[in-house]
Amino acid sequence: MSYYAFEGLIPVVHPDAFVHPSAVLIGDVIVGAGVYIGPLASLRGDYGRLILEAGSNLQDGCIMHGYCDTDTIVHENGHIGHGAILHGCVVGRDALVGMNSVIMDGAVIGEESIVAAMSFVKAGFQGEARQLLVGSPARVLRQVTDQELHWKHLNTKEYQDLAIRCRTGLSETKPLTQAEENRPRLKGTTDVKPKSAQ
């Protein structure tokens, strides 16, 4: 793992969290229990504090950063999709930020809200609970349905379980030169399906 102290501040990582070896954590970063941090994520706590609360996930290629005297926070069970950027913002409990979305300074995503993939949430946006945000700039489309929230919970559970699986089942290796006959398929721990398959 790439952990760097910055001006005396050392990242804090709960022993039950999983941080991929290619992720980078610098300075004032606090990672809670059961958190999953994916490959190539960058958490640059060289100005503001970065906090990932228990059960949250920050997937492949995500960036967290913020200005001095600010906290960038992903609250409990927050779900941050591949390639998203969080800058000086707050993501509420059980909220989901879709792939390649950008959440700007001072923005607050309400608890149990969903930010659609590729959305841009402007600085200072103050969200409420269970909002579906879509577009660039993002606007509130409607309330998140119970079915959508259930789908989000299943996805987050997969990443919470993946943190455990990676701590015990991930190891560096050399590739095979060809696929073996009857190559097994990996399984998740829930019955979650892509939204298009629902």
From Swiss-Prot:
GO biological process: carnitine metabolic process
InterPro entries assigned: CaiE, Hexapep, Transf_Hexapept/Carb_Anhydrase, Trimer_LpxA-like_sf
A GO molecular function held by the record: transferase activity
Pathway annotation from the record: Amine and polyamine metabolism; carnitine metabolism
Classification via Gene3D superfamilies: Hexapeptide repeat proteins
Annotated stretches, region: Disordered: 174-198
Biased composition (Basic and acidic residues): 180-198
Keywords from the UniProt entry: Repeat, Transferase
Function: Overproduction of CaiE stimulates the activity of CaiB and CaiD.
HAMAP family: CaiE
Family per similarity comment: Belongs to the transferase hexapeptide repeat family.
Name of this chain's protein: Carnitine operon protein CaiE
Organism, scientific name: Salmonella typhimurium (strain LT2 / SGSC1412 / ATCC 700720)
Lineage: Bacteria, Pseudomonadati, Pseudomonadota, Gammaproteobacteria, Enterobacterales
Gene that this polypeptide is encoded by: caiE
